[in-house]
Design a protein with these regions (language model features):
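Alpha-helical transmembrane segments of multi-pass membrane proteins
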Residues: 1-11, 78-87, 151-157, 220-222, ...
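Perimembrane loop-to-helix junctions flanking transmembrane segments
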Residues: 11-23
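Transmembrane alpha-helical segments and their boundary/interface "anchor" motifs
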Residues: 26-35, 46-82, 91-108, 119, ...
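Transmembrane alpha-helical segments
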Residues: 37-44, 122, 126-129, 184-195, ...
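Membrane-interface helix-boundary motifs at transmembrane edges
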Residues: 49-61, 127-139, 193-206, 259-273
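Hydrophobic alpha-helical segments with transmembrane-like composition
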Residues: 78, 82-86, 94-160, 175-185
Length: 294
């Protein structure tokens, strides 16, 4: 929610230092979409870990109820109740209404819904890759490196032709196809296969993760401030290699925080159990003592 709010604030007459603070905050939270994609795929693979394939009937039934239908309903609401929010033109007949509906041009933020729904559709394929990798480090390297090459090659192509290129207007729909977030979805699924090893690594080398996060944050912030106008947030895109690396750093940091929370809560629960047992033993001792007296 902060991203559109900050974008709105930057249209107000703030001085340079205030704009710098808002842009830095915007850059700080520019990770949410990759992190959500990672978390969604991680969760689906975790829940279906004991099955060779996704139970397609129940899986797609659940996804329709939880994701597809709400997305379609909100899109319809935006087009009918708030038509002024449309992007890339406005509908003026049935054909253009259908186009605006399915291209998710109804509002600026619906591009992410299209992205998420695509990953839900290709989830059986991601599950197949995770099953193929299983717990093989060699296959893991093959999957990680090959998908990384495809992904960063795509980012270079996107940057050259669309983000800062001649086809920004004509090829704008390419900002919402799944390949633009490929590694976040695939790495999310593969992370479950190796979650014990990842947890051990992150908990052991937490200082490295924190340092990596800080380095990538200040690097992406400096790159943006040195290259673009402060108020031109459209160029602070997910589809830059530096932002992709930053998103991965944030995902690792969130993963680390979750592990730390789990360990902390386990200690709290153990301490609570100890206090409970101590209370029981104290009551038993007091009862025995009173019986002995009387």
């Amino acid at each position: 929610m902060l991203q559109p709010i900050i974008t709105l604030f930057l249209t107000l007459p703030f001085d340079h230092s205030q704009q710098l603070f808002l842009v830095s905050l915007y850059n700080l939270v520019k990770f949410t979409s990759p992190a959500f994609i990672f978390g969604i795929v991680f969760t689906v693979i975790r829940k279906n870990d004991q099955q060779a394939k996704l139970p397609l009937k129940s899986y797609f039934s659940d996804q329709w109820d939880n994701n597809f239908f709400p997305t379609f309903a909100w899109t319809l609401f935006y087009l009918i109740a708030m038509p002024n929010l449309q992007q890339h033109g406005h509908f003026h007949n049935i054909a253009t209404f259908i186009w605006q509906f399915f291209s998710d041009n109804a509002t600026p933020h619906l591009w992410y819904s299209v992205m998420m729904l695509q990953f839900l559709l290709i989830m059986p394929g991601i599950k197949s890759v995770c099953n193929w990798v299983q717990h093989s480090y060699r296959r893991l390297l093959i999957a990680v490196i090959s998908s990384g090459i495809i992904y960063f090659a795509w980012l270079i192509f996107y940057d050259h032709f669309i983000l800062n290129g001649p086809e920004a207007t004509h090829w704008y729909l390419l900002d919402r196809i799944f390949i633009s977030f490929l590694i976040f979805g695939l790495y999310g699924g593969l992370s479950w296969n190796f979650h014990h090893e990842i947890q051990t690594f992150l908990f052991t080398y937490w200082w490295l993760i924190v340092g990596f996060y800080l380095l990538t944050y200040f690097r992406t912030r400096d790159l943006f401030l040195a290259t673009f106008k402060l108020t031109d947030l459209a160029n602070d895109s997910y589809y830059l290699p530096s932002m992709a690396i930053y998103a991965l750093a944030v995902i690792l940091l969130i993963y680390l925080i979750c592990i730390a929370q789990k360990v902390f809560m386990a200690k709290i629960n153990s301490f609570s159990s100890f206090l409970c047992l101590s209370s029981i033993f104290s009551q038993c001792f007091l009862g025995s003592y009173l019986l002995a007296i009387f």
